[in-house]
Amino acid sequence: PLSYRGGDQPNNALSLNVFNPGEISSSAGTSGVVYGVLGDVNYDDKSRVNTFAHVNHTAEQTRLGVLLCINGTGILNAWTRRNVAPEGNGYADMNDLAAQVPIGSDGVCVVPFGNGAERVLENKEIGCSISGINFNKHGKAHIVRAAQEGIVFSFCYGMEIMQQMGMDISKIHAGKANMFLSPLFRNTLASVSGATIELYDTDGSVGAAKGAGIGAGIYKDNKEAFSTLDKLQVIEPDVVRSEEYMAA
């Protein structure tokens, strides 16, 4: 018998023990996602975010997943590594390079929508753009930092839509992987969104396995299933520098 089924983002949310209204998960691979749970039926009338049944939805207990997707996330960071960063630089080197530049990248702005149509923009395909460059002032480090900041700002634009639907995004659960390995990315996301970020040692494949185990009765309840979930790190918003982040 089939004990569980779910897509990649519900699996990721499940792996992070995200089941109840107000709980939020995120991932930041090739594309980036913020996924939250609603306890009532709601939707964005422009379909900029998707609403569908979460893994624990029943007729008696409404549990809907709301999914924000930003296509130009890790793919932009990878493009920046190939085309902008110094030859041989890895992602950790890029983070060190970007750290040499102040918040806001001295006015350089990267709009990260270069991976096809974006649902959050009502399926418009506007492309990626880089602006604000001064040939006498800016270099590779500015573009590397601005790319990560642009991704964060696009996340926050979509999160505002989710908040308009009644979601309280005060805490984000994520696996410590992909762009969440970047201190710059996660610190900027926490400080711009105002949300605490909790990083865990898990991924979507673990979620699929846990879901199957819960469905098959191997675990007596969710508490038992996630008793071994390991929290690795907590990132708080930088309230001291919040004005700098918001001005950027």
Task: Report residues per predicted region.
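Short pre-catalytic strand/loop immediately N-terminal to key active-site residues, enriched for Gly-Thr
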Residues: L2-S3, L199
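Short beta-strand scaffold segments in enzyme catalytic cores
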Residues: N11-L14, G32-G36, V110
